Amino acid sequence: MTKYAQGKFRPKNPDKYIGGSMPTYRSSWEFHFMKFCDENPSIYKWASEAIKIPYRNPFTGKQTIYVPDFFIHYVDQNGKQKTEVIEIKPEMHTLKEKTGRNRRNQLHWALNQVKWEAARNWCKSKGIAFRIITEKDMFHTGGR
């Protein structure tokens, strides 16, 4: 069985973190993003798993909840305040062509699409952005 990096993150700048206790990271990528949020001077507030977005599961037909990984407030390069909801995902979970013939991967991809559409709609109604960040975005891999 694969071991995943998990643990509690201790912010160096706890005044920036929105939440009552130390956030939990569920992957090394989430850990790196928490560190980025904590140390980046442009990010003035951030939260982990703080938002609940309702959506209908297309496989069960039941109403359920999607909890995106992060919620951040920052100042962009033009000095404008921005807010984003962020999901950290491996690229293979974001591209249909990367699912291959594996049925489980295909179902996982399809469910992600429904969750992310709900997140986009929720964010649009609040005037904020939704972004999916992959390893290519975080670590600039893939020839960029």
Please identify what each model-predicted range represents.
Residues 1-144:
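Electrostatic, structured charged patches in enzyme active sites and in nucleic-acid/phosphate-binding
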